[in-house]
């Protein structure tokens, strides 16, 4: 009996202590060691910032590092519009960067599906055989540029209309983070995890946007895809680099 009472008392003490620890743990937000929101968030005060964060950048939104020397975010409505534009373009840039590199990588491994260089692939529609998706005529086969453009406009219009209107009628979903059927893995179920994923998304999206800009410049300057440009640079860094190509565009005496 004494053993049972002692065990019960010990169990009660343990449960109380565990409950306090659990409550304290639940109260503390999850963190990766760096704050991304609020006044104590990580900041990047770039040129002409006078080492001060504008009052209108409060750290409420993901990707806010406190730098806005041009005052682009001063007006709330303009800021809201720019946030939407940046995020949508960042997502397209991530898909685009992946799409620019994947065909070249597959072609290097021996996969044959027509033109692998991203800025040359579309021109295959003007060839005699037309454009075959992945080089397979049984998949998507395109020969008419007008019909292809019309289909793209219609499909993109439907998708954008769906997004802007918040998804299916009556659901009222967030046009930027709709969730539900757009999040089948439940990545946004936990609010703290979701908040951190928003930051990761916009950071990687900004990097992808710069990557796409670089791919465009490479296409104009070298006439090659990003993977081939990387291979050329690694093979001979002193000859194949940005500085060497830049000299070709400088006026000569």
UniProtKB/Swiss-Prot annotation:
GO CC terms: chloroplast thylakoid membrane; photosystem I; photosystem II
Keyword Membrane: yes
Keywords carried by this UniProt record: Chlorophyll, Chloroplast, Chromophore, Magnesium, Membrane, Metal-binding, Phosphoprotein, Photosynthesis, Photosystem I, Photosystem II, Plastid, Thylakoid, Transit peptide, Transmembrane, Transmembrane helix
Keyword Ribosomal protein included in the entry's annotation: no
Binding, chlorophyll b 1: 44
Membrane topology label: Multi-pass membrane protein
Modifications the protein undergoes after translation, according to the UniProt entry: Photoregulated by reversible phosphorylation of its threonine residues.
Modification type Phosphothreonine: residues: 22
GO biological process, one term: photosynthesis, light harvesting
Residues that coordinate or bind chlorophyll b 5: 152, 249
Coiled-coil segments: none
Residues annotated as binding chlorophyll a 1: 67, 73, 86, 206
Quaternary context: The LHC complex consists of chlorophyll a-b binding proteins.
Name of the protein this chain belongs to: Chlorophyll a-b binding protein of LHCII type I, chloroplastic
Gene name as annotated: cabII-1
């Amino acid at each position: 009996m004494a053993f049972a009472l002692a065990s019960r008392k010990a169990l009660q003490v343990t449960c109380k202590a565990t409950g306090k620890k659990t409550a304290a743990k639940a109260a503390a937000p999850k963190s990766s060691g760096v704050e991304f929101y609020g006044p104590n968030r990580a900041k990047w005060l770039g040129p002409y910032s006078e080492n001060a964060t504008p009052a209108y950048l409060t750290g409420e939104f993901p990707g806010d590092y406190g730098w806005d020397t041009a005052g682009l975010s001063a007006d709330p409505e303009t800021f809201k519009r720019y946030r939407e534009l940046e995020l949508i373009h960042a997502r397209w840039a991530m898909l685009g960067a992946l799409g620019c590199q994947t065909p070249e990588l597959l072609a290097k491994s021996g996969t044959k599906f027509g033109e692998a260089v991203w800025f040359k692939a579309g021109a295959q529609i003007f060839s005699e055989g037309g454009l075959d998706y992945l080089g397979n005529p049984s998949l998507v086969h395109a020969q008419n540029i007008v019909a292809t453009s019309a289909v793209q406009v219609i499909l993109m219009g439907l998708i954008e209309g769906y997004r802007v209107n918040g998804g299916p009628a009556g659901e009222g979903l967030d046009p930027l983070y709709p969730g539900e059927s757009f999040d089948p893995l439940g990545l946004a179920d936990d609010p703290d995890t979701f908040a951190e994923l928003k930051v990761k998304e916009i950071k990687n999206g900004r990097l992808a946007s710069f990557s796409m800009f670089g791919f465009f410049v490479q296409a104009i300057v070298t006439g090659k895809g990003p993977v081939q440009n990387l291979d050329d640079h690694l093979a001979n860094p002193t000859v194949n680099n940005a500085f060497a190509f830049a000299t070709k565009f400088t006026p000569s005496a």
